[in-house]
Amino acid sequence: DLGVVASIADKVAVMYSGEIIEYGTVEDIFYDSRHPYTWALLSSLPQLATTEKLYSIAGTPPSLYSEIKGDAFAPRNPSPMAVDFVEIPPKFPVSDTHWAKTWLLDNRAPKMSKPEGIQDLHAKMLKIYDQAGGANLG
């Protein structure tokens, strides 16, 4: 439950298919996430001030019993790159406290903006954070 995590944790590790795919402070993950799976998780958080249907991640998680080639999230990623299906991404540093395993952070990757919904969500969460005086979201 990301809401609980935000209210009690200082650091967050986002896991997918048994691997940590993004790591950082609460602020890094909630306001500047970089992995498409983290974006999908944040998009699926219920918003109290809306009646919109919750976002649902397409597809199913991979079996932990079969070998995964490339980025495990690639088949469910709405905008995967070819490299996602063949090579596991390394940890790419975002800052001294934040890293993510996504080819989007490779300097050879095409420059992509965060999905509009994530940009809006990051802005909303940052506003809540600022109103709370910089305290955790809880």
Language-model features: where?
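Aromatic-residue-lined binding/catalytic grooves and analogous aromatic/hydrophobic interfacial grooves
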Residues: D1
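NTP-binding/hydrolysis catalytic cores, primarily Walker-type P-loop NTPases
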Residues: A132-G138
